[in-house]
């Protein structure tokens, strides 16, 4: 329903928007709200990658990089630092932009970063992040081959970030 007049809405612009059906209100075009989110590949001084398992993931083998929504009044780099601290207790130094990916559900835009850890002692929150660990390229490859870890899906920016660190496609 139209948030201005309450009339029904119909898909518009090939599904990227909605159009109000109220002609008296000008059949206004409505665009979805986009929720900004950050996703961060965190590396330490030994070029190990921090991977974590989220409590919401059904596959216990799935590990990915840090991610979370940007809060009101927060810049993207601060969101990366806050999420890393909240989820793993890791303090970040330099944070560098890598790219972005639309994430349709829940209407999010994922902005990807690579960050360098200042601290390496992992302390997961136990609520959102259940486990987290540092891995070398050889350790990660061995975990994947043994089936003890699973990588994020092929169409995700998380997988691209891991492959960029790994130096090859999975």
Per-segment meaning from a language model:
Residues 74-75:
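Surface-exposed, charge/polar-rich loops and edge strands
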Residues 1, 16-19:
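The −1 position to Zn-ligating cysteines in a subset of zinc-ribbon hairpins
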């Amino acid at each position: 329903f139209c948030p201005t007049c309450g009339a029904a809405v119909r898909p518009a612009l090939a599904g990227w928007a909605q159009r109000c059906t109220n002609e008296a209100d000008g059949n206004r075009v409505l665009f979805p709200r986009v929720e900004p989110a950050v996703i961060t590949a965190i590396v330490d001084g030994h070029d190990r990658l921090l991977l974590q398992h989220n409590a919401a993931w059904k596959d216990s083998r799935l590990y990915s990089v840090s991610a979370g929504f940007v809060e009101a009044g927060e810049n993207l780099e601060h969101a990366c630092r806050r999420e890393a601290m909240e989820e793993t207790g890791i303090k970040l130094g330099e944070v560098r932009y890598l790219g972005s990916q639309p994430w349709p559900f829940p209407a999010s835009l994922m902005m990807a970063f690579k960050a360098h850890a200042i601290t390496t002692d992992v302390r997961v929150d136990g609520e959102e992040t259940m486990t987290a660990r540092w891995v070398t390229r050889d350790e990660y490859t061995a975990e994947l081959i043994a089936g003890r870890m699973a990588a994020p899906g092929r169409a995700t920016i998380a997988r691209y970030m891991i492959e960029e660190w790994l130096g090859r496609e999975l």
